[in-house]
């Protein structure tokens, strides 16, 4: 549970610490706005994707399923600034599939907390393997990190790409290549 009162007080302290007047017209409501925003963007804390991935549908095919270009927004746990991009999820069902929107909800659960892109990638893959009992999962995440864009090295447009493979994707190079080809279509 997010403690909005602590966030408000902390935000006031930060504004004062950087030399701002917390009673200035444009800043008076900022601590409250930040508290409400944090409640939304950190809503994945303490959650897992089980509730979204538990309702499945029988299929008579074990062919590859790919949901690509799922937009995500998250907060870098090192600097608490945004990183955002696209997630591509491929899985091989084991007789059961999940509604496609549930894959996007899975991404939401794990992206809405202080996060590392590497961990985001593996948490998505592990949850799909576990809750869908998939034969294999491949997750590719492309992200732009504001901690590299607006501070430090200041390299706007630089993308970080992370991948992880589970099950059949560990064994079959041509399967991975098929997914990369479909992602680039």
From Swiss-Prot:
Pathway assigned in UniProt: Cofactor biosynthesis; 7,8-dihydroneopterin triphosphate biosynthesis; 7,8-dihydroneopterin triphosphate from GTP: step 1/1
GO MF: GTP binding; GTP cyclohydrolase I activity; zinc ion binding
InterPro entries: GTP-CH-I_C/QueF, GTP-CH-I_N, GTP_CycHdrlase_I, GTP_CycHdrlase_I_CS, GTP_CycHdrlase_I_dom
Catalytic activity: GTP + H2O = 7,8-dihydroneopterin 3'-triphosphate + formate + H(+)
This protein's record includes keyword Hydrolase: yes
EC number(s) reported in the record: 3.5.4.16
Class of this enzyme: hydrolase
Binding site for Zn(2+): 76, 79, 147
Entry keyword set: GTP-binding, Hydrolase, Metal-binding, Nucleotide-binding, One-carbon metabolism, Zinc
GO cellular component terms attached to this protein's record: cytoplasm
Disulfide bond sites: none
One biological process term in Gene Ontology: tetrahydrofolate biosynthetic process
Pfam name, any one: GTP_cyclohydroI
PANTHER family the UniProt entry points to: GTP CYCLOHYDROLASE 1, GTP CYCLOHYDROLASE I
Quaternary structure annotation from Swiss-Prot or TrEMBL: Toroid-shaped homodecamer, composed of two pentamers of five dimers.
Family indicated by similarity: Belongs to the GTP cyclohydrolase I family.
NCBIfam families linked to this entry: folE (TIGR00063), PRK09347.1-2 (NF006825), PRK09347.1-3 (NF006826)
Protein name per the record: GTP cyclohydrolase 1
Gene (UniProt): folE
């Amino acid at each position: 549970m997010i403690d909005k009162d602590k966030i408000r007080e902390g935000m006031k302290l930060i504004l004062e610490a950087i030399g701002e007047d917390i009673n200035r017209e444009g800043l008076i409501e900022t601590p409250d706005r930040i508290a409400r925003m944090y409640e939304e963007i950190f809503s994945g804390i303490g959650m897992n994707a089980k509730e979204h991935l538990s309702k499945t549908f029988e299929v008579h095919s074990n062919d590859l399923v790919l949901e690509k270009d799922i937009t995500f927004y998250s907060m870098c746990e090192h600097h608490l600034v945004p990183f955002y991009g696209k997630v591509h999820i491929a899985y091989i069902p084991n007789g059961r599939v999940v509604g496609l929107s549930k894959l996007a909800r899975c991404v939401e659960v794990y992206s809405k907390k202080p996060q590392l892109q590497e961990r985001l990638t593996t948490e998505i893959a592990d949850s799909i393997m576990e809750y869908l009992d998939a034969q294999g999962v491949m997750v590719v995440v492309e992200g732009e990190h504001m901690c590299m864009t607006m501070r430090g090295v200041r390299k706007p447009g630089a993308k970080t790409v992370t991948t992880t493979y589970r099950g059949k994707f560990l064994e079959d190079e041509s399967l991975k290549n098929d997914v990369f080809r479909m992602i680039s279509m």
